[in-house]
Amino acid sequence: MLGIESSCDETGVGIVRGTTLLTNTVSSSMDEHVRFGGVIPEIASRAHLDAFVPTLQESLQEAGVTLEDIDAIAVTSGPGLAGALMVGVCAAKALAVATGKPLYAINHLVAHVGVGLLDGNRVSEGKHDAVAAAGLGAGKLPENLGALLVSGGHTEILRIRSITDDVELLGSTIDDAAGEAYDKVARILGLGYPGGPAIDKLAHQGNPKSIRFPRGLTQPKYMGTAEEKGPHRYDWSFSGLKTAVARCVEQFEARGEEVPVADIAAAFQEAVVDVISSKAVLACKEHGITDVLLGGGVAANSRLRELTGQRCASAGITLHVPPLGLCTDNGAMVAALGAQLIMAGISPSGVSFAPDSSMPVTTVSVPA
């Protein structure tokens, strides 16, 4: 199975055989977006056009296969940037028509879960934080599985009953995604782009307790109770937090004081990680979820991995974290989900579908 990913600024091509990863080749256009402080859709789309053929050729060479050896093709058809998605979808359709291979249009977010099925892709985060080094892989998911996806475009908690046709959205951000908030706060603090790694690194030098930033949607009117759930019990909001950081910086500057950038970075990060991990664990406990997969680019954040692992362990939940190279956007995760669709007997999507930038997570693959 060959997988193609182009939903944002990474051009990814991955090849799997069943649940065995053969190759995962990624070309990122991140450097082209740095001076703008964020991803520019037009630049990302043009970068995909330039990178696709070399990335495909490199992937086939590393896997030691040809297009004739490929049984089927899977491509991310949403959600994501419309122009970026279009490049990958058009490339996949061209390959499918030229080779006569079946084509599967799959959901980018569910693919982040599918990557957990690849053999030998687990890592352990220390000794006591319940990050599993086993339990996924070999094409079998735990019976009561959830997924916490945290990236620049998405922050969601999912319940996975079947990776191929039964995915439920339990909670999501109602405004900015966590990764987007990191980028915007990094810009406020003058740390550059991408903001996630910069804030994570600087936060180690600061005191997270020096400033108390708000945790969005945690008031009783939003949370409710286990018996009578509030309207946003498992949802997140980061726009107010971003505004609070901006006002904090303005207050220091208005008083003519030096802005404690490291302390603000640490306090901001603690606010984000605190509310993400607490709500995710709450959703898991109240839905009988015993295993949760952490994915998305922000899964690289050291404090998110640490605190989520600690809280999962305290709740008796096993946290699974793929290697960082498979947490971010890549073609291997698309191929992994595509392979599962074939093994489940799901029909291909054909070539008449269109990319869907707002594709709901409940749509695992596009029917013909």
Curated annotation (Swiss-Prot):
<comment type="function">
    <text>Required for the formation of a threonylcarbamoyl group on adenosine at position 37 (t(6)A37) in tRNAs that read codons beginning with adenine. Is involved in the transfer of the threonylcarbamoyl moiety of threonylcarbamoyl-AMP (TC-AMP) to the N6 group of A37, together with TsaE and TsaB. TsaD likely plays a direct catalytic role in this reaction.</text>
</comment>
<keyword id="KW-0012">Acyltransferase</keyword>
<feature type="binding site">
    <location>
        <position position="108"/>
    </location>
    <ligand>
        <name>Fe cation</name>
    </ligand>
</feature>
<feature type="binding site">
    <location>
        <position position="329"/>
    </location>
    <ligand>
        <name>Fe cation</name>
    </ligand>
</feature>
<protein>
    <recommendedName>
        <fullName>tRNA N6-adenosine threonylcarbamoyltransferase</fullName>
        <ecNumber>2.3.1.234</ecNumber>
    </recommendedName>
</protein>
<feature type="binding site">
    <location>
        <position position="200"/>
    </location>
    <ligand>
        <name>substrate</name>
    </ligand>
</feature>
<dbReference type="GO" id="GO:0005506">
    <property type="term" value="F:iron ion binding"/>
</dbReference>
<comment type="similarity">
    <text>Belongs to the KAE1 / TsaD family.</text>
</comment>
<dbReference type="InterPro" id="IPR043129">
    <property type="entry name" value="ATPase_NBD"/>
</dbReference>
<dbReference type="InterPro" id="IPR017861">
    <property type="entry name" value="KAE1/TsaD"/>
</dbReference>
<feature type="binding site">
    <location>
        <position position="112"/>
    </location>
    <ligand>
        <name>Fe cation</name>
    </ligand>
</feature>
<keyword id="KW-0963">Cytoplasm</keyword>
<keyword id="KW-0819">tRNA processing</keyword>
<keyword id="KW-0479">Metal-binding</keyword>
<feature type="binding site">
    <location>
        <position position="183"/>
    </location>
    <ligand>
        <name>substrate</name>
    </ligand>
</feature>
<dbReference type="InterPro" id="IPR000905">
    <property type="entry name" value="Gcp-like_dom"/>
</dbReference>
<dbReference type="Pfam" id="PF00814">
    <property type="entry name" value="TsaD"/>
</dbReference>
<dbReference type="GO" id="GO:0005737">
    <property type="term" value="C:cytoplasm"/>
</dbReference>
<dbReference type="GO" id="GO:0002949">
    <property type="term" value="P:tRNA threonylcarbamoyladenosine modification"/>
</dbReference>
<dbReference type="InterPro" id="IPR022450">
    <property type="entry name" value="TsaD"/>
</dbReference>
<feature type="binding site">
    <location>
        <begin position="149"/>
        <end position="153"/>
    </location>
    <ligand>
        <name>substrate</name>
    </ligand>
</feature>
<dbReference type="GO" id="GO:0061711">
    <property type="term" value="F:N(6)-L-threonylcarbamoyladenine synthase activity"/>
</dbReference>
<feature type="binding site">
    <location>
        <position position="301"/>
    </location>
    <ligand>
        <name>substrate</name>
    </ligand>
</feature>
<keyword id="KW-0808">Transferase</keyword>
<feature type="binding site">
    <location>
        <position position="196"/>
    </location>
    <ligand>
        <name>substrate</name>
    </ligand>
</feature>
<keyword id="KW-0408">Iron</keyword>
